[in-house]
Amino acid sequence: MADRLFGTDGLRGTVNTYPMTVDVALRLGLAAGIRFRRGQHQHKVVIGKDTRLSGYMFESALTAGLCAAGMHVIMTGPLPTPAISFLTRSMRADLGVVISASHNPFQDNGIKFFDADGYKLPDMAEDEIAAMVLDAGFSWPYPDSRGVGRATKIEDAGGRYIVYTKNCFPAHLTLSGLRIVVDCANGASYKVAPLALEELGAEVFRIGTGPDGTNINEHCGSLHPDVVAAKVREVRADIGLALDGDADRLIVVDERGVVLDGDQIMALCAQAMMARGELPGNLLVATAMSNMALELFMRDHGGQLLRTKVGDRYVMEAMRREGAMLGGEQSGHLIFHRYSTTGDGLLAALQILRIMREKERPLSELAGLLTPFPQKLINVRVEKRLPFEERPAIGEAVAQVEKELGGRGRVLLRYSGTEALCRVMVEGEHEDRVRTYAEDLAQVVERELR
């Protein structure tokens, strides 16, 4: 049942369309409250959101359900997803809740949960919550009238997060003299990200810091790095930072205006952490989408790359299991486990800036250590989510491309965990061939899964 409700990053969909409706949100609040109401202590929940107009109504619905279940709710207002993870830990809350659809347009929204340690919930916990929500006849074990929770707002949540991120930056270093362009996507980081960088001494040029409820991710943020790249060239900045709507993802632009993806940043950070002795087992965790060049880079530098399913939660699960300190996704989710329990765009930016400060070299030189194989990713909108093996034509097309790549490339097909899309990725040594292979495969997928 849970697969009808939760995807790879919580619940997500179009506002006022199932499952992103107020009644589902109310039941989610009730179910999560009951699931995490354990023991006799005062039960607390931290709720944050991004800047979407619909965030207000979902915040109210979730709060009502949680309070009805006996949980005390602490509302932070708009804050990055990793800030809610941090506050859940630091405030000793039982649960953290984020209302956001990340990089999606404002018409969408989503709900995801963190446990008391600041980690995203495992599938089993989500299954238990979903079972209660989807059971129309479920008998809710309400507390008596004295056991109902109350809701309060916390006014200094953003300041607490800024202090936390600054404490993850070496005390003997500053950002004085650096010119930084930061694009906050008119999202959750619109206040905290520029302030944190300015307090560390940087000269900050702001983009996407005027949210109006409907302009989140609109021609800005991590999905539009060309915007920050143009600004970097215009103001001759040292680096550009593009965050997504909930600021758990980061895309970086060097001083020339060249966009660097998550793989290039992971290579840079892994090398620095290995040199500092901060990467246990010289292990980096990434997903199936990461470029083959990253795998070869780690091997050539005495390290190893462990691949997981796509989704930063699966990266984090593998990091916990293996004791890894660095992991991430090509899309820009970067996890520094020494400091955080989830992807954090601002924290990742500070780790990159630390390397720039310590090396005193431009980012273009530092990031040049990884040359990715040409890779083409095509998103195909689909009506059916059938197992690929049930469509022989797809398997035959994949086999033909793999044969032509001759072991010097990869083909990956996967369904999006949050949208009605099939992602077709081809990687190889020759850009023109890679593009042709991907386009041909995408046509087959579209035809077979309509």
UniProtKB/Swiss-Prot annotation:
Catalyzed reactions per annotation: alpha-D-glucosamine 1-phosphate = D-glucosamine 6-phosphate
Cofactor(s) this protein requires: Mg(2+)
Residue ranges of coiled coil: none
PTM comment: Activated by phosphorylation.
Family of the protein in this entry: Belongs to the phosphohexose mutase family.
PANTHER family, alphabetized: PHOSPHOGLUCOMUTASE (ALPHA-D-GLUCOSE-1,6-BISPHOSPHATE-DEPENDENT), PHOSPHOHEXOSE MUTASE
Keyword Acyltransferase: no
Residues bound to Mg(2+): S102, D244, D246, D248
Key words of the record: Isomerase, Magnesium, Metal-binding, Phosphoprotein
Gene3D superfamilies: Alpha-D-Glucose-1,6-Bisphosphate, subunit A, domain 3, Alpha-D-phosphohexomutase, C-terminal domain
Function of the protein: Catalyzes the conversion of glucosamine-6-phosphate to glucosamine-1-phosphate.
GO BP: any one term: UDP-N-acetylglucosamine biosynthetic process
EC number: 5.4.2.10
Catalytic residues in the record: S102
Modified residues (Phosphoserine): S102
Any one GO MF annotation of this record: phosphoglucosamine mutase activity
GO cellular component: cytosol
Keyword Magnesium: yes
PROSITE patterns attached to this UniProt entry: PGM_PMM
Protein name: Phosphoglucosamine mutase
Disulfide-bond pairs as recorded: none
Pfam families the UniProt entry points to: PGM_PMM_I, PGM_PMM_II, PGM_PMM_III, PGM_PMM_IV
Textual note on the cofactor: Binds 1 Mg(2+) ion per subunit.
